């Protein structure tokens, strides 16, 4: 197995395909021409030789995705419980082969579920409706964020969507430092997958990634709130709206949820005490 920090070294063009498309503009149906379309492939997460989940995803940053999914789904509590990963092609897509600790693998087998992937679907394969909104340890109130610094982050979020710039087809998730600087970010055709990539990256970065907040380019669903809380993220900013269940879960687990984030404005759904308005 390769070191868990190993990543696929590919160019942005490896995540797009040129296809012949016909463009329409008012009163003008143009002749077919080549344009970029985002790649979407089945990605199987295989723990100790057993396939656990198949998700539709962009074929990059997959070790970060596997780490983030493992943490946000409660398969592991610490990156140290994964000993290594390899990304390998399979007949229909890609596999991330994960070397999981024996103790965690026994627990995984006890709760095993088969997820058949729609794009970034966080609910597919849950065996009972009662499994939705599983209990999350309430978060501490150890973080604060000055909303005056959010504009800087919003301005540069698009920098982490190179495939999105070519295709208009990806979501982004980025880590915002207290200063508003973006420490890093990831993109994917699935918003949940983009967030898992960010959470996996954060788990393997240094202490500077402990302070700050997560920022997503999409709406905030309950799964995204729950994944963030499972990974100890206290503040989640979303460019679009939040759902009612997302607000309920955020309230229950002490997560500060903020939606409709635009320059100079935002909607605070839960726990505003972490936020400073300058």
Curated annotation (Swiss-Prot):
UniProt-annotated location(s): Cytoplasm
Alphabetic keyword roster: Cytoplasm, Molybdenum cofactor biosynthesis
Catalytic residue list: 121 (cysteine persulfide intermediate)
GO cellular component terms attached to this protein's record: cytoplasm
Entries under Pfam families matching the protein: FdhD-NarQ (PF02634)
Binding site for Mo-bis(molybdopterin guanine dinucleotide): 260-265
Database matches in InterPro entries: Cytidine_deaminase-like (IPR016193), FdhD (IPR003786)
Gene3D superfamilies named among the record's database cross-references: 3.10.20.10, Cytidine Deaminase, domain 2 (3.40.140.10)
Keyword Cytoplasm in record: yes
Keyword Transcription carried by entry: no
Principal place of residence: cytoplasm
Gene Ontology MF annotations: sulfur carrier activity; sulfurtransferase activity
SUPFAM superfamilies named among the record's database cross-references: Cytidine deaminase-like
UniProt-listed GO biological process terms: Mo-molybdopterin cofactor biosynthetic process
PANTHER family: FORMATE DEHYDROGENASE, SULFUR CARRIER PROTEIN FDHD
Similarity field: Belongs to the FdhD family.
HAMAP family: FdhD
Role noted for this protein: Required for formate dehydrogenase (FDH) activity. Acts as a sulfur carrier protein that transfers sulfur from IscS to the molybdenum cofactor prior to its insertion into FDH.
Protein name: Sulfur carrier protein FdhD
Native species: Salmonella typhimurium (strain LT2 / SGSC1412 / ATCC 700720)
